[in-house]
UniProtKB/Swiss-Prot annotation:
Nucleotide-binding is among the record's keywords: yes
Signal peptide start-end: none
Segments for region (G4): 477-480
Family matches, as Gene3D superfamilies: P-loop containing nucleotide triphosphate hydrolases, Putative DNA-binding domain, N-terminal subdomain of bacterial translation initiation factor IF2, Translation factors, Translation initiation factor IF- 2, domain 3
Protein name (record): Translation initiation factor IF-2
Residue numbers spanned by region G2: 402-406
Disordered: region residues: 199-269
Biological function: One of the essential components for the initiation of protein synthesis. Protects formylmethionyl-tRNA from spontaneous hydrolysis and promotes its binding to the 30S ribosomal subunits. Also involved in the hydrolysis of GTP during the formation of the 70S ribosomal complex.
SUPFAM superfamilies attached to this UniProt entry: Initiation factor IF2/eIF5b, domain 3, P-loop containing nucleoside triphosphate hydrolases, Putative DNA-binding domain, Translation proteins
Annotated stretches, region: G1: 377-384
Region named G3: 423-426
Binding site for GTP: 377-384, 423-427, 477-480
Keywords from the UniProt entry: Cytoplasm, GTP-binding, Initiation factor, Nucleotide-binding, Protein biosynthesis
C-alpha cells in the first residue's frame, strides 16, 4: 500500500481524523496535521502500539461493573446411570464491564487447545473458570478463555454460593448480566462436551443432561429469560461467521430445553438465529422514498423508517402544522423528505390515464384543416362587431350591454376558405377565458381601436398569445372615424414588442372597419396566408379529441358542452370523456343551431348527453366503451379530491395568525348561480379580488343553472346574498324567498355585480374618525366660582369655541389635561359658542389647575367616509 495522508488513512480505517492523530502521537510519532504523509514503517509502529495497548487495556482499564460467581454441579459420564462415572464441576466466573467511547474491532482469538480429561473416581471435581464476552453499543466485556484443571476433592453436599459485587447499579448493567449468565451456562456445557471423548459422548442419554437443571436455575434472571418473561431481541440480518462465533460457540443454541420439553430440530435451528446485540449504523442510511401525489404523515414516516413524531417535528420547524393522519400534498412531502436527508422519488399514479391513451384508437389519415382563429382585444374595441360582419349576423346585439361574456365558437365559410373563430371577452374579469382561447387556437387576431390605442386588456391578450406561442395578426379597427390614428397604435404596440412588417418586424397589420367592411377581405387573406405557412393538418379517421370551450346547464336539454374538435371525427353515439364527466353523445348541434351527425377537426359543436357540466378548458376525448370512461372519470375525481383536501389542510404558522386576526374581519357570503361555466369562474374570481383585510367576499356556493329551493335554503342558513347571472329562480324558490324575506339579485352585465358588491363591502367597513380643531382660546386670567370652581377668562384667538365639546389644556405646547368644556359664558350669560376675537369665561369640568398663559384647544370628532 502506497504512502497516504493522515486524512486518507482515517477514512480507510473508518475513525475520526482527531482520534487517529491522538493514536499516532501516543505511538511516539509526531503528527499534527491531517495532510501529513504516513509511510509503511510508521503504519507498522502504529499497529504494534495498538496491539500492545489493546492487551494492556484489557487488564488496566477501569472497572465499572464486576461480577464474581462460583457454582458446583455434577455430570455423569458413561453408558448408563449405574456404570457411568460422576464428574464434579466447579464454575468460577468473573466479568468486567468497561465504558468505551468507540468499540474497536475485536481481534480474532484462536481457540485454545483443551487437554483431554482423565476419568477419575466419583469424588473427583473439575473447576472451570470462564469469562464471557458480550458486546453492546456502550459496554464491552473482557474475555478469558475457559481452562480445565483438576482441583481438590470437595464435599458433594456443598451448596452453590454466589458473591456479586456491583460498583454501579444501573438498569443498563442488569440487562448485560442477564445475557452474561446465559452465556456462562452455554460455555460450561460446551467445555464439558469437548472434554468428554467422542466414543463416550455418543453414549450419553439425553435424560442425564437434565441434571444441569439446578445450574440453569442459579439466577432468577436466567429462569425468567427461559420462561419467556424476557423476550430476546430478534436480529433479522444475516450474520457473518465471526459474529456467530462470538455469540454461540460450538454451533449450539443459547436456549436450553427444560425437562420434559421436546423441541424439533427445525425449531432449534430457528432459535440459533436469535441474538441479543444491536449494532448502531456507522453512517446515516439514505433511502429512496416514493412519493405519490398525496400521502399521509404516518405513511411518509413509514417509508423513511422513522417515527411519525419526527416527521411532524420537521414539518413544524418548516412552519407547517400537521397531525399523524393528515394528508399532505406531493410538494410538501418532497420538502420534508429532503430536509430529513433522504432522496425523494416522485411517482405519478396515472396508470389509468396511460391505459386510456393506449385504448384510444389512433387514425392514420391526415388532411388539411381550417385554422382556429381567436379574436382578442380590449372591451368595446369591436371584436364581436368584426365577427358579425364576417358572419353577416348580429351577435353583438344579443349580448347584454353589448359586451361579450361567453366564448363564442363559430365556423365560417368564406369565398377564400373555411375559418373557425373564437370570440373571447375583453373585460378584465375574463382573464381565464382568454387564456383558454389562446391555448386552443392557431392564430390570434388582436383588435385595437384606432381612436383608443393600446389598453390593459390589449397588453394581456399579447401576453396570452406569446405564452401560447401563437402568431398574431393586428387588426386596427374603427378606421372610418375621423380621429383614427393608426400610427399611434403601431407606436404603442412596438413598445410591447409587436413590430409591424413595414417596420421590419414579423407581425402583419391590417387597417379595417367592422362597421363599413373596409379591409375585411385583406384580413381574411392575411389569416389564410398565415395558416398556409403553419401547414395545419389533422387526423380525420381516428377517435375524436378536442377541448371544452364552454359549458352550461340547459333546462330542457340538460348539461350542454361546447366542444372544439381538434383531431379525429366526433360522431353521434360516441362515448365522450370530458374531465370528470362522461356520457354517450345524444345530439350534436352546430353553431348555426342545426343538428349534425358528426364533426371533424376545427369544427365547434354543442354536445348533449354528458353526466354533468364539465369544466371549461377540459380535454374531451372519445373512449371505446362506457366502462373505461367511468373508470377514468372516477379516478380523476378521487385524485382531485385528495389533492384539494391536502391543500386545504396545509395550514402554516402564518396562516394560524391570519385566522386569529380574520375572526375580527367581516365576511360577505354569496350564493352565485350563472348560465355558463366560464362566466361563473370569471364572476367568482372578480368578486374574490374585492376582499381586503377588513372585509372579505366568500362565494360559499356556485353553480350553473337556475336558482333552486336548496340555493335559497343555503342563503338563509349562511346569511348570504343570492345572485343570479342570466338565470332566474323557479316558482318554489321564489315563494320560499318571499316567505323568508330573502332578496334575489338578478344581473346580466358583470359590471353591475362588481359595483353592487363593492358598495355592500364599503358599507361593511368600520368607520374612521378624525379629530378636527374648531377653536383655540388663550387664558388671560383665572377666577374662582363657588359652584363650578376655577373659571378661565379667555380670548378666542382662532376658530370657534363651542359648548360641550371636548377640550385639551396646553401649557408650553404640552397637553396637560383632556376633558369636556362644562361652562361657557359671555358677560354672565350662558352661550352656545364664542367666535374669534371675543372674550369668554370657560369652566373645565373636574379641573382647577388652569393658569394664565395656558391654551384651551377645542376639537370635535368627525367620521370619515371610507372606500375600498
Amino acid at each position: 500500500m502506497a504512502d497516504v495522508t493522515v486524512k486518507q488513512l482515517a477514512q480507510v480505517v473508518g475513525i475520526p481524523v482527531e482520534r487517529l492523530l491522538n493514536q499516532l502521537q501516543e505511538a511516539g510519532l509526531s503528527f499534527t496535521d491531517d495532510q501529513q504523509t504516513v509511510n509503511e514503517e510508521q503504519k507498522r509502529i502504529l499497529l504494534n502500539h495498538l496491539k500492545g495497548s489493546s492487551n494492556r487495556d484489557i487488564s488496566a482499564a477501569p472497572e465499572r461493573i464486576t461480577l464474581r460467581r462460583k457454582s458446583m454441579s455434577q455430570v455423569t459420564v458413561g453408558h448408563d446411570m449405574h456404570s457411568g462415572k460422576t464428574v464434579n464441576i466447579e464454575v468460577r466466573k468473573k466479568k468486567t464491564f468497561i465504558k468505551r467511547s468507540a468499540i474497536p474491532e475485536q481481534a480474532e482469538i484462536e481457540e485454545p487447545v483443551v487437554p483431554p480429561v482423565v476419568e477419575e473416581p466419583v469424588h473427583e471435581e473439575i473447576t472451570v473458570v470462564s469469562e464471557v464476552s458480550a458486546e453492546t453499543p456502550e459496554l464491552k466485556e473482557t474475555e478469558e478463555h475457559p481452562v480445565i484443571e483438576p482441583v481438590a476433592e470437595l464435599d458433594e453436599t456443598v451448596k452453590e454460593e454466589e458473591k456479586i459485587s456491583l460498583e454501579e447499579n444501573t438498569a443498563e448493567s442488569q440487562d448485560e448480566l442477564t445475557h452474561a449468565n446465559t452465556d456462562v451456562i452455554e460455555n460450561l456445557v460446551d467445555v464439558v462436551e469437548e472434554a468428554i471423548p467422542a466414543s463416550k459422548k455418543e453414549e450419553v442419554k439425553p435424560e442425564k443432561v437434565s441434571k444441569k437443571k439446578h445450574l440453569e436455575q442459579t439466577d432468577s434472571d436466567i429462569s425468567e429469560f427461559k420462561k419467556g418473561k424476557k423476550k430476546p431481541k430478534y436480529h433479522t440480518f444475516e450474520h457473518d461467521e465471526e459474529e456467530q462465533e462470538l455469540h454461540r460457540r460450538g454451533g449450539r443454541s443459547k436456549f436450553k430445553k427444560k425437562k420434559g420439553t421436546e423441541k424439533s430440530d427445525k425449531y432449534r435451528e430457528a432459535e440459533e438465529t436469535l441474538t441479543h446485540g444491536f449494532a448502531l449504523p456507522t453512517a446515516p442510511i439514505v433511502r429512496e422514498v416514493l412519493i405519490p401525489e398525496t400521502i399521509t404523515v404516518a405513511e411518509l414516516a413509514k417509508r423513511m423508517s422513522v417515527k411519525a413524531a419526527e416527521v411532524i417535528k420537521v414539518m413544524m420547524s418548516l412552519g407547517a402544522m400537521a397531525t399523524i393522519n393528515q394528508v399532505i400534498d406531493q410538494e410538501t412531502s418532497v420538502i420534508v423528505v429532503e430536509e430529513m436527508g433522504h432522496k425523494p422519488v416522485i411517482i405519478k399514479e396515472d396508470a389509468v390515464e396511460t391505459g386510456l391513451g393506449e385504448a384510444i384508437s389512433k387514425g392514420t389519415k391526415t388532411e388539411g384543416r381550417a385554422p382556429v382563429v381567436t379574436i382578442m382585444g380590449h372591451v368595446d374595441h369591436g371584436k364581436t362587431s368584426l365577427l358579425d360582419y364576417i358572419r353577416r349576423t348580429k351577435v353583438a346585439a344579443g349580448e347584454a350591454g353589448g359586451i361579450t361574456q361567453h366564448i363564442g365558437a363559430y365556423h365560417v365559410s368564406t369565398p377564400k376558405g373555411n375559418i373557425t373563430f373564437l370570440d373571447t371577452p375583453g373585460h378584465a374579469a375574463f382573464t381565464a377565458m382568454r387564456a383558454r382561447g389562446a391555448q386552443a387556437t392557431d392564430i390570434v387576431i388582436l383588435i385595437v381601436a384606432a381612436d383608443d390605442g393600446v389598453k390593459p386588456q390589449t397588453i394581456e391578450a399579447i401576453q396570452h398569445a406569446k405564452a401560447a406561442k401563437v402568431p398574431i395578426i393586428v387588426a386596427i379597427n374603427k378606421m372610418d372615424k375621423p380621429d383614427a390614428d393608426p400610427e399611434r397604435v403601431m407606436n404603442e404596440l412596438s413598445v410591447q414588442e409587436v413590430i409591424p412588417e413595414a417596420w421590419g418586424g414579423d407581425t402583419m397589420f391590417v387597417n379595417i372597419s367592422a362597421k363599413s367592411g373596409m379591409g375585411i377581405d385583406d384580413l381574411l387573406d392575411a389569416i389564410l396566408l398565415q395558416s398556409e405557412v403553419l401547414e395545419l393538418k389533422a387526423v380525420t379517421d381516428g377517435a375524436a379529441k378536442g377541448v371544452v370551450i364552454e359549458s352550461r346547464l340547459d333546462k330542457g336539454r340538460g348539461p350542454v358542452a361546447t366542444v372544439l374538435v381538434q383531431s379525429g371525427t366526433l360522431h353521434k353515439g360516441d362515448i365522450l370523456l370530458a374531465g370528470f364527466q362522461y356520457g354517450r353523445v345524444r345530439a350534436l348541434v352546430s353553431d348555426n343551431g342545426d343538428l349534425v351527425d358528426s364533426a371533424g377537426p376545427s369544427i365547434p359543436v354543442e354536445v348533449l348527453g354528458l353526466s354533468a357540466i364539465p369544466h371549461a378548458g377540459d380535454e374531451a376525448v372519445v373512449v371505446p366503451d362506457e366502462k373505461k370512461a367511468r373508470e377514468v372519470a372516477l379516478f380523476r375525481q378521487g385524485r382531485f379530491r385528495d389533492v384539494k383536501l391536502a391543500r386545504r389542510q396545509k395550514t402554516s404558522i402564518e396562516g394560524i395568525m391570519e385566522n386569529m386576526t380574520a375572526t375580527e374581519s367581516k365576511v360577505l357570503n354569496i350564493v352565485l348561480k350563472a348560465d355558463v361555466q366560464g362566466s361563473l369562474e370569471a364572476i367568482s374570481d372578480a368578486l374574490t379580488k374585492l376582499s381586503t383585510d377588513e372585509v372579505k367576499v366568500e362565494v360559499i356556493s356556485s353553480g350553473v343553472g337556475g336558482i333552486t329551493e336548496s340555493d335559497v335554503h343555503l342563503a338563509i342558513a349562511s346569511n348570504a346574498i343570492l345572485i343570479g347571472f342570466n338565470v332566474r329562480a323557479d316558482g318554489t324558490a321564489k315563494r320560499l324567498a318571499e316567505q323568508e324575506s330573502v332578496s334575489i339579485h338578478y344581473y346580466s352585465v358583470i359590471y353591475d355585480i362588481v359595483d353592487q358588491i363593492k358598495g355592500a363591502l364599503t358599507g361593511m367597513l368600520a368607520p374612521q374618525f378624525k379629530e378636527e380643531i374648531v377653536g383655540i382660546a388663550e387664558v388671560r386670567d383665572v377666577f374662582k366660582s363657588p359652584k363650578i370652581g376655577a373659571i378661565a377668562g379667555c380670548m378666542v384667538i382662532e376658530g370657534v369655541v363651542k359648548r360641550n365639546n371636548p377640550i385639551r389644556v396646553l401649557r408650553s405646547n404640552v397637553v396637560i389635561y383632556e376633558g369636556t368644556l362644562e361652562s361657557l359664558r359671555r358677560f354672565k350669560d350662558d352661550v352656545l359658542e364664542v367666535r374669534q376675537g371675543f372674550e369668554c369665561g370657560i369652566g373645565v369640568k373636574n379641573y382647577n389647575d388652569v393658569k394664565p398663559g395656558d391654551l384651551i384647544e377645542v376639537f370635535e370628532t368627525v367620521e370619515i367616509k371610507r372606500d375600498l
